[in-house]
Amino acid sequence: MNTDNASLYVKWLKQEVAPALGCTEPVAISFAAAYAAQYLDQPCTKISGFISANLYKNAMGVTIPGTTVCGVPLAAAIGAFGGDPQKGLKTLEDITPQHVEMAQKLIANNAVDIAVEETPDFIHLDLTLSAGDNCCRVVVKGTHTNVVELYINGQPQPLSEKQNTRTQRETLPTFSLQQAYDFINRVDFNDIRFILDAARLNSALAAEGKTKKYGLNINGTFSDAVKNGLMSNDLLSKVIINTVAASDARMGGAPVVAMSNFGSGNQGITATMPVVVVAEHLGVDEETLARALSLSHLTAISIHSRYTRLSALCAASTAAMGAAAGMAWLFTRDINTINTAIINMISDITGMICDGASNSCAMKVSSVVSSAFKAVLMAMQNSCAGANDGIVCADVEQTINNLCRLVIKPMTLTDKEIISIMVAK
């Protein structure tokens, strides 16, 4: 295949499928605070600034990794005392209970004041950390670790080439599902072998989620239902339980890294675990799994790149469309089955809202992976939502564009109302 095109898809995968510790919105706040703290010569005594409304929505209610606490002020303060900005989305990997205690004391002293503001960028943080006579201000926007401005004691500082390389994402052209399908069928296995890390990391997270009650423990509820004969111990149940176990752990603050997709751990989990479970069921080799995972993650990327990084739409739903593509490919290798499965999913779960990251996200994950599996089964029987059914049409690309049109236009008002409700709580 064209090596330039192959390079594009590998770039997309390496850029958007990345390890992350904890829900990425509170981690982004911790990262910004940690980034500023490294320029202070003593522990910070004050944190101030603002974050975008969408960032607030996804940071206020989810457990901060390695802790049992949540909240925007705590995310900032914990990052300031224990974060390592060199680790990007894994910035909280080395925090300790002492860091949490220091953060709680700072908040108790009313020394953390972070406002919520409407900004053009859905991801926007502007934090200033002070210690003694010194202060450092950091501005992050566009993506979770994209540092665009740095000020020390009010003076702007140049961002080094190393800093820019670490934090900025390359703007890459979008692509169709057919192009992704062609790529994963033709690419050399060694060029995509790295995607197996997604299976390794997210499977480890799922295993952690089964060790104790994280979040709402939805995987435990379903596992008990299987034991008690209320659910079947079939492939669908295994897909749901293993995917939700990782999401439970993720949202419940497990100190275990996830492989994310498009800046979201839950999206990475959703695009990975159903494919892993089906691959294990079919007994395929690593190369086949790598191709299926690449298709799943590329499909999720192709869809999400057509709408905003944060929105009123639950993005686990579009990540699950990637999982549907990966599962359909494992079962059939047929592009028409893949396209049909995605059309079926859009007919099924369009409109599931994102009302912020929280433990209940795992419930949404269980819903979307169930929809994905159902859509694949229907597609394998040549059963497809009709072109006259709502927003779907015969062409999968146009159907995806119709979905994204809803997200970009009318659902922006939905998003504002959701945030308004949450801020008023």
UniProtKB/Swiss-Prot annotation:
InterPro entries: Ser_deHydtase-like_asu, UPF0597. GO terms for molecular function: L-cysteine desulfhydrase activity. Transmembrane segments: none annotated. GO terms for biological process: L-cysteine catabolic process to pyruvate. Belongs to the UPF0597 family. This is UPF0597 protein KPN78578_43500.
